[in-house]
Amino acid sequence: MNNNDMDQKAKELQNVLEQFYLTTDNPKRKEIDTILNNYKAQSDSYEHVQYYLVHSDNQYVIWFSLSVIEDKVNKAWNSISASSQTQTKGLLLDIYLNKTGANSNSTVKNVLPQFIISKLGQVIADIGRYEFESNPQSYLLNITSIVRNPSTSIRGINLLQCISDSFTTNKKVISQQKKTTLKKLLHQNSPIIIQVLVDCLGQLFDQNAEKKFKHANLLAFHVGSPDTNTYTASFNAESKNLTKAVFDALLSYFTWVPLSDLLVPSLFDILFKYLRLDKNSIPALECLNEIVSKNLVPKGFESFLMRIFHQVYSLLTDIVSNGGQQINQYHPEFLNKFTQFIQIFINNHLGRIETNPNFPIPDFLGLLFQYSFFQTQPESFLQCIDIWSTFLDYLINLSQENGTPPPSKYTDGLLLFQSELVKRILYIFNNNTLSELDDEDKEINENGISETQLESYIKKSIEVVAKVTELYPEKSLENLYPLFTQNVTSFFCKAEESIKQGVSMENEQQFQYLVKDVTTILHLFGRLADQFVVSFAQTFTAANFIFQKLLDMCLFSVNQYIYKFGSDWEKLQIELLCTIRSFCFWLAEYGNQVRAIVGQQPDFDSNITKLISIIVPLFERNAPESILSSAGKLLMSLATISKPLNLFTQMDMLISNIHNICAPLSPSIQSILYPAISCTILLPPSNVNLSQQWDQRRPKYSPFIKGITASFLEIPQIPNFVEGKIFCKEELIQRVLRVLKVVTAIIRTVPEVTQAKSILHDGIQDTLKVTLGLFRVYISYPIVLEAILDFFFVLFEFLKAQVGVVFTQQTISTFLDILGGDNLNQLLSSGNDTGISIIKKLIEILTFIVQQPGNSFESLLGSTIEFSMEKLYPMIANTSSVLRSPFFTLLYSILDNHWKQCQQIQINSILTSFQSIFKQNDVNLFKQNLDHFEKLNSKLKLYEKISSMEPVFGCSFISMFFDVLISDTQSVHTDDIIVTIYRFASLNFDKFFNEFFTTFLVQKNQLSNEQKQILRSNFSNAIDQPTFSTNMTQFINDFSYFSFINS
């Protein structure tokens, strides 16, 4: 074929490729992909693309040509002649070194884009895998000569990085044995490579940097200190690119080279020098971060740790000099990386340095203190706070493990840190920063809690303040006490005075930030309330003063309706209630103490009476729901945590009037307040020597619960309720939903006291049958069905013994009967979220029932399996439904608790469904079910049972797991799958090695007989788990590799 023909082919290829890449919505895209793959497979395509590389300047043609050569290199490099190999390599190297704009003197007009340059380097490195194995020294000598040549230096450095990536690849494009050999050889030669790169950095540094000044009078260290000069540099564009390329290459090696091989003084010296450069220190920091992040620390590392510490200390000294003005001279990205560096250093190595007298940790913390509070960006400040949190966790754990007080050498410094940290969350000290933080848009944090940026900032800071308090409780509380006595009390005095003078609080500017600060201080003391319990006797006077003031402030806020002054005042009132609630554990301890001291009970009772008299009026004054919710939760905590001795008596008036109070309230508030009253009646004092007062509590409870359920019990008696479609009326639907929500909340909070549960069950017994009857009536109303199922799930969970077996069986049978046919299809059709929620709740109920010990619910087993496997499973098996996870938990629970009661056909059906799902790509469900299998194997010897089920299963599960590993669809779970296979194999290693492998490999038509023989012979018959796992890893890699080269 002459050049004209080849040029025409190149143009045709260019046209096809541009259609493929430039028109992503092209309907012929799949067809074009097939054409391109067919062209790749042609025997002459390899020769053609080498012509295109020389004569075409179209980036798509060049990329395609390189991909063809890459295929040949990875799949059939040894099948072409040595001369052809040399020619191809020479062509690629020529393009790579001379036609990619490698240096500023290049005359190439059309410099190739970076993605093609990277591809070139990768293909050249892939070819190098064949050469390196036979003569690594010669190969590296050629590469280093490219590095040392000024005109090609950057390409040589890029190639060293490509070599690291290619020779240590996890891709299954080379055999496992070759991977191991390549990595071993590259590891042996890595000191040469790293030294070449270090020399490059040194040369660039000498050419472009000069000394600015040297630190004097830094701490005297006990080992040779590294260079702490500060340098300035003037790197041109070419030098910058070279420097970046070297650091990128170093990072590539640092990710896998053991730390012991990196402990080279010349490496650390040059990294430290670059660290002290004005503008080029970020890459050096990234390299140091990679080094200190390694957890496997070799002997001799401590001296290098000392050198690193000295650099951190020196750099911190620089940054915090001139009263923090110097920090503005550093690039924000550098400061971010440097903070990360300190964080990693503290996380991984604090235990090594904290007890070493050569490390002046207090002085270091002093610099870190300044560095933290000089930060100007909230995100940067919180990064520093995370470092302090790590350090405090270390001290707390050390103190707890050793049973000793925390080190006194940190006391003063940490108390000062605590004080300064508190200032950072108060507007009076930090107005500018706090005002910039978003306090409107909420985001879900790492704990699943929705909060604004401002709330997150304050909460994280308070948590660190609390850790200091945990370390030094008495001194910390003494340190923080004035915040409350001065700021909070004076604020309320000022607010009260302003109201008396008729000042309009909504527009009063002096209160704008004071309200927010007081809210924050209240939040802080609420968080610290547990420390008043820990040091109860020592801090009683201060805690009692705070509690009394909280009551006074709460009374003021209720009487003055302060929530009407604006949203900040509403938040303040909520925080007041939350802070008092935080003191419920302190109240519990207070109550326990006064019971042993004659004459002090009346004072305690007076506090409780006052608290109740303050809270109750809120429910009668149409306050915002957020405040009512907090008030209701406070009453619940009072009843369930504080458990005052005379609470039942003190709440008598509220109990008697509760229905009048609750009538105008929303169902959400009723479902908080009613359970609080329920617990007040049902929960006696915890002291066993005190009267439980059941003779008074039971008569009180009956009218209480009837007052809630009476309107609900009347519903079935309504004339023509069903026939006349009266049940469809919105008022009746809302009545059903309200009562079910309230009663469900009451059941959920029932005390773990048999007598209490009995009283509750007696009170709602007539409600149960009515509720079950309504399930059939409201079958077309998913929102009602969901409420009913939620009710029964909670009922079975908390009142299982009281409800009894007969009613439980009747209820479950009703559910399965009603939801087992067309209703199930309707609920799950078209992504009906409420319908899905209903079925999920049903699955959870069935799971709970199945998990109950004994044979009480054995009669439900058959219908549960039938519903699950014949009706529900076909609808969700091949979907991504959220029901799949709870569904398979139900199946696991059936096997776990009722294997012996299950028929063989049922077991087979369940195991087949597991096997089917294992073949799918759902990573989370795969892991869940694999864990289920491991638990079943531990308890029931599942794998032994499966292996004995021939010909139903035989080795099909092992084959399936092998196929999953080969497909790479569950690569994140590879180790767990191999463990499972080992457990199967260990039942009969002879059968596994002699029968399974033969059968498995015979079925794999994509491999040649020779390849199958290699796979089998490489898998030794060793039965210890480590060797087995290694063999499995090699088998899966090589199977995939053979499939790849055969494709």
Curated annotation (Swiss-Prot):
GO molecular function list: nuclear export signal receptor activity
Gene Ontology terms describing biological process: protein export from nucleus
This protein's record includes keyword Magnesium: no
Gene Ontology cellular-component terms listed: cytoplasm; nucleus
Pfam family, one: Xpo1
Entry annotated with the keyword Cytoplasm: yes
Subcellular location: Nucleus; Cytoplasm
Family in the record: Belongs to the exportin family.
UniProt-recorded name of the protein: Exportin-6
Species of origin: Dictyostelium discoideum
Species classification: Eukaryota, Amoebozoa, Evosea, Eumycetozoa, Dictyostelia
